[in-house]
Swiss-Prot record:
This is D-alanine--D-alanine ligase. Its cofactor is Mg(2+); Mn(2+). Keywords: ATP-binding, Cell shape, Cell wall biogenesis/degradation, Cytoplasm, Ligase, Magnesium, Manganese, Metal-binding, Nucleotide-binding, Peptidoglycan synthesis. Binds 2 magnesium or manganese ions per subunit. One of its GO terms (molecular function) is D-alanine-D-alanine ligase activity. Residues 106-305 form the ATP-grasp domain. InterPro entries: ATP-grasp (IPR011761), ATP_grasp_subdomain_1 (IPR013815), D-Ala_lig_Van_CS (IPR000291), D_ala_D_ala (IPR005905), Dala_Dala_lig_C (IPR011095), Dala_Dala_lig_N (IPR011127), PreATP-grasp_dom_sf (IPR016185). Pathway: Cell wall biogenesis; peptidoglycan biosynthesis. The keyword Nucleotidyltransferase does not apply. Gene3D superfamilies: 3.40.50.20, ATP-grasp fold, A domain, ATP-grasp fold, B domain.
């Protein structure tokens, strides 16, 4: 018989080595404080300094994984935890690895008939054959260029002129071997949290700049968030169903946040999955959960209870 959660020793994995280390440290400290306030035996563990493979030997029973980006959100730490036999929060190995790859996630959604932006894929090796004219004829202008793998909107560029396309792709190639060139979606940006099997209310994101980049996500205070997002009940319901399908198709579990854009005609287009959403004071998941009655601490405990 497993020990009750309150008697278990919980490792809060935070920090790590990805480009999103700072965000993860902030999220991790918030989660740690919440768990301790709720009477849990929780300890901060930074994989940059501590060998995660030793956690079980050190008497830990369970992991709250709040690492962001590569190494923490891409299936590798999940695989390690499976190997040593420790239950952990969030998605498993396959869903974590898949959703870290924006291109393959979109291809899978598309195969299931779910709506995504039209895109072209460029790799480091195919870059020399890139023909901006052909791309623009297919996708129009402006365009969004982004690395397939890096999180937190690192390496993004909005391309307004055909002559700027190559340099934008070169910039994105600094962050990843594979780059997506996507049609520009001109409508609202929404994000939808999912907790277990419960789809929480959508949030509308209104950045003051051109789009929601790293600065707007984590630093700026002038990005506006609206929850409820202002959709009609009917549209919210449609969005809820779409997001739940998208979540199930890629095999998510525990909790995730799915980003959605509206195109020029007001149709929903799936953008990406965040399998370890931020849990800082700026973060969107707790904002949405609060509107249906979860305090930050209750939310953290619920995520822990969903761990497998």
């Amino acid at each position: 018989m497993a020990k009750p959660l309150k008697q278990q020793k919980i490792a809060v994995l935070l920090g790590g080595t990805s480009a999103e280390r700072e965000v993860s440290l902030n999220s991790g400290n918030a989660v740690l404080t919440a768990l301790r306030n709720q009477g849990f035996d929780a300890h901060p563990i930074d994989p940059k300094e501590y060998p995660v493979a030793m956690l079980k030997e050190q008497g830990f029973d369970r992991v709250f994984n709040i690492l962001h980006g590569r190494g923490g959100e891409d299936g590798t730490i999940q695989g390690l935890l499976e190997q040593i036999g420790l239950p952990y929060t969030g998605c498993g190995v396959m869903a974590s690895a898949l959703t870290m790859d924006k291109m393959r996630t979109k291809m899978l959604w598309k195969a299931f008939g779910l709506p995504v932006a039209d895109m072209e894929v460029v790799t480091r090796t195919s870059f020399s054959q890139l023909n901006p004219q052909v791309v623009v004829e297919k996708l129009g202008l402006p365009l969004m260029v982004k690395p397939s793998l890096e999180g937190s909107s690192v390496g993004l560029t909005k391309v307004n002129a055909i002559d700027d396309l190559k340099s934008a792709v070169e910039f994105a190639l600094q962050y990843d071997e594979t780059v997506l060139i996507e049609e520009w979606l001109s409508g609202d940006e929404l994000t939808v949290p999912i907790l277990g099997n419960e789809v929480l209310p959508s949030i509308k994101i209104v950045p003051q700049g051109e789009f929601y980049d790293y600065e707007a996500k984590y630093i700026a205070d002038n990005t506006q968030y609206f929850c409820p997002s202002g959709l009609t009940e009917e549209r919210e319901q449609e969005l809820r169903q779409l997001v739940k399908q998208a979540y199930d198709v890629v095999g998510c579990r525990g909790w995730s946040r799915i980003d959605v854009m509206l195109d020029g005609e007001g149709k929903f287009r799936l953008v990406e999955v965040n399998t370890n959403p931020g849990m800082t004071s700026h973060s969107l998941f707790p904002k949405s959960a609060a509107t249906v009655g979860y305090s930050f601490e209750q939310l953290v405990v619920k995520i822990l209870e969903l761990s497998l």
